[in-house]
């Protein structure tokens, strides 16, 4: 409360909610302000039952990735951007990548010993790091890069290389998919695809590199690079309208890809598709009318070791309050 005019700012709000867009009343006695309770509920679409159910106790977390053997999981808390590892059932929680600014997008190495992730510092471009999965000091993958965002790391099946997307720098609209040899730090580039791409995903058998076509700031299709033929192929043509094609994940056998996209009428309500790597027509896996996504990147989705879709549901609230000022 304001009991008398003050020459210094006075805090009006407290607690876990975030407050925004304050507007004073005409008589100056009140302030109308929007309060946001930002949190999510992790849910899984059970493909056998066709029902949505809480996952890992419904924690508020996203960016999940499971170890290759399916025994462990890494995720980012929401809000807060803290990386945690745990057993598959959510027990034995341990923080990794401490003292980072905003770590997210974690990926287990094939042998489970390391985790690659992206950190968004307060200033400067995003950076890719690798950290021991049991905790330790993160090591930057491309320490010489100072101009471009490094995003979406993906492991080669043998764990010796990382592929990542280098986003457009200021004044440059091109993107690059780089492959880094982790023992030598030598960098190679994938051949330029027909369309600009982002979000690489190495197939489990190592033959393919999947990428999302990127007509910045939107993503609208899928392309795949065949390391055997050394050629790109368009797997899914552009999806017109919003939302974009997002968050592709390989099936365990490497024969198909799960992704989130719009329905036939270009509406977004939690639609998950699967498409085979040979380019057959996409199959609708989950259709969730009324689903409201949450998370730092809003419409994240992944799959669990049994290939059930997992998503973060918006469990927060938005209210408008009137704060009376005591003069």
Feature-to-residue mapping (PLM):
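C-terminal recognition in membrane/secretory proteostasis and scaffolding
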Residues: 263-265, 278, 284, 302, ...
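Surface-exposed loop and edge beta-strand positions of immunoglobulin-like domains
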Residues: 34, 45, 76, 86, ...
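A generic "binding-loop/recognition-motif" signal
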Residues: 18, 38, 48, 60, ...
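Short loop/turn segments that connect beta-strands within beta-propeller blades
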Residues: 2-7, 46-50, 87-91, 132-136, ...
């Amino acid at each position: 409360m304001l009991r008398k005019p003050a020459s210094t700012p006075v805090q009006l709000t407290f607690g876990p909610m975030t407050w925004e867009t304050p507007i004073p009343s005409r008589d100056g006695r009140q302030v109308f302000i929007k309060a946001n309770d930002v949190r999510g509920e992790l849910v899984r679409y059970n493909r056998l039952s066709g029902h949505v159910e809480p996952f890992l106790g419904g924690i508020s977390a996203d960016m999940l990735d499971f170890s290759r053997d399916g025994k462990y999981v890494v995720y980012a808390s929401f809000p807060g951007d803290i990386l945690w590892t745990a057993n598959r059932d959510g027990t034995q929680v341990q923080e990794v990548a401490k003292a980072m600014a905003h770590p997210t997008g974690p990926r287990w190495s094939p042998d489970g010993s390391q985790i690659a992730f992206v950190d968004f510092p307060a200033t400067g471009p995003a950076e890719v790091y690798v950290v021991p999965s049991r905790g330790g000091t993160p090591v930057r993958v491309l320490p010489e890069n100072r101009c471009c965002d490094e995003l979406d790391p993906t492991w080669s099946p043998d764990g010796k290389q990382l592929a990542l997307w280098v986003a457009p720098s200021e004044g440059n609209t091109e993107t690059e998919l780089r492959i880094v040899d982790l023992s030598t730090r030598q960098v190679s580039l994938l051949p330029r695809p027909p369309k600009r791409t982002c979000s690489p995903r190495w197939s489990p058998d190592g033959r393919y590199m999947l990428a999302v076509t990127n007509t910045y700031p939107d993503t609208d299709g899928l392309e795949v690079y065949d390391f055997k033929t050394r050629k790109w192929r368009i797997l899914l043509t552009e999806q017109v309208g919003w939302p974009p094609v997002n968050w592709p994940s390989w099936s365990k056998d490497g024969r198909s890809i799960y992704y989130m996209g719009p329905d036939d009428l270009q509406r977004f309500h939690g639609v998950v598709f699967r498409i085979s790597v040979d380019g057959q027509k996409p199959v609708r896996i989950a259709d969730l009318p009324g689903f409201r996504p949450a998370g730092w990147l809003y419409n994240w989705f992944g799959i669990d070791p049994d290939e059930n879709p997992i998503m973060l549901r918006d469990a927060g609230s938005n209210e408008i309050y009137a704060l009376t000022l005591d003069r």
